[in-house]
A protein has these predicted regions:
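N-terminal acidic leader/helix
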Residues: 1-22
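Short coil/turn linker and secondary-structure boundary residues
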Residues: 3-7, 42, 53
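Short, amphipathic alpha-helical "recognition" segments used to contact nucleic acids or chromatin
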Residues: 25-42
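DNA major-groove recognition helix of helix-turn-helix
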Residues: 30, 38, 51, 62-66
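Short, solvent-exposed alpha-helical "recognition" segments
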Residues: 44, 59-70
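Short alpha-helical "recognition helix" segments of helix-turn-helix
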Residues: 47-49
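Key DNA-contact positions within bacterial/archaeal DNA-binding proteins
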Residues: 56
Length: 70
């Protein structure tokens, strides 16, 4: 894995672990970090595996998969 990608993965792990700041800011930072990783070329299943969540959860957190609201 590329050094840039490893650094981004570590930053995302730290962000999720700390969960500091307001909820809205945390969600925005988490979404941006996930999308940055995907833009660097890491596929969604691998992103999920690296941070310990499912592919669907990673995509939902990144805003790529919205839940149905009824």
């Amino acid at each position: 894995m590329d050094e840039d990608i490893q650094q981004e993965v570590q930053n995302l792990r730290d962000l999720i672990h700390k969960h500091e700041g307001t909820t809205a800011r945390y969600l925005t930072e988490r979404r941006r970090a996930l999308n940055r990783l995907n833009k660097l070329g890491l596929p969604w299943p691998m992103i999920g595996r690296e941070i310990g969540i499912t592919t669907q959860t990673a995509m939902r957190w990144a805003g790529k998969w919205s839940r149905l609201r009824r």
